[in-house]
Amino acid sequence: MNFSNDSEEKVFNEIFDQLPTLIKDKCSDYDELYGYKLNYNDSKEKLVEQYYDEDIAKALIFKICKAYQFDKTKIITSIVDILNWRKSFNPLSAAYKETHNEALQTVGLLTSYPDDEPNKRVVTWNLYGQIVKKKELFKDSSKFIRYRIGLMERGLRLLDFNNDANNYMTQVHDYKGVSMFRLDSEIKACTKQVIAIFQKYYPELLYAKYFVNVPSILSWMYDLMKSFIDEQTRKKFVVLNDGNKLGNYLKSCPSENYGGTDKKNNLQKQDVDTPRPTPYALYILESQANEDID
């Protein structure tokens, strides 16, 4: 963690000291963030002993502090909102427990490039050319949203929050095959909801976002995303009309369609298997399963 000044460090320490009280009083004791335990003062001491990692907990809280420029009031509000949302939405279930429509597997993919530049090693791909072919999937927006959040959570599992070279994700939005279509209102509504969720509940996790094969007809999409985000995030956006130029930015991406160095595998073959949840995430999922049985 790198603080710009003593004031930032003071705010961080105050927030971290308040964390157990916030979790107890404002979050119904729910303390899981991206699969990691936050409450170092849990009354269930065995849980702290088994699952608490102070370095990771501090790294995650630091990210939220950084996202809100060390504004204490905003940080507290964000922590409470995030934990309460996670308790109600249950993104761990979306990532590891639920069975999603098989067709969605062609819409969103996850790749891992351990030898690439810092923070370009975990990449989520959104293939809008596939989306327009499967508009029926968006009749029930909640199903797509749960799938997309699940994909995000699985990507987070591949990050190392103690490693500055791999504690952010990169995203690719590919619009190949969309030039002759306009995304209909249901797809737009889903997109808008997902953007809002990422902005509010996943702060300071995006390193870069590449928009590739973007036809002028879809300029609304880029404008929509810009309207939801702050200036710092907008600086992370790169628009490429030619998808084959992506290899200049993500060297390990497939040579096919994207101009990367991997000539053996296309994007579908690069798609990684579902990673194993963190030990604490497994504990929570097992506890939920036992409650369901009861």
From Swiss-Prot:
Keywords: Cytoplasm, Endoplasmic reticulum, Heme, Iron, Lipid transport, Membrane, Metal-binding, Microsome, Transport. Residues 97-266 form the CRAL-TRIO domain. Its main location: cytoplasm. It catalyses: a 1,2-diacyl-sn-glycero-3-phospho-(1D-myo-inositol)(in) = a 1,2-diacyl-sn-glycero-3-phospho-(1D-myo-inositol)(out). CDD domains: SEC14. The keyword Endoplasmic reticulum applies. One of its GO terms (molecular function) is phosphatidylinositol transfer activity. Its cofactor is heme b. Belongs to the SFH5 family. Non-classical phosphatidylinositol (PtdIns) transfer protein (PITP), which exhibits PtdIns-binding/transfer activity in the absence of detectable PtdCho-binding/transfer activity. Regulates PtdIns(4,5)P2 homeostasis at the plasma membrane. Heme-binding protein that may play a role in organic oxidant-induced stress responses. This is Phosphatidylinositol transfer protein SFH5. It comes from Vanderwaltozyma polyspora (strain ATCC 22028 / DSM 70294 / BCRC 21397 / CBS 2163 / NBRC 10782 / NRRL Y-8283 / UCD 57-17) (Kluyveromyces polysporus). The lineage of its organism: Eukaryota, Fungi, Dikarya, Ascomycota, Saccharomycotina.
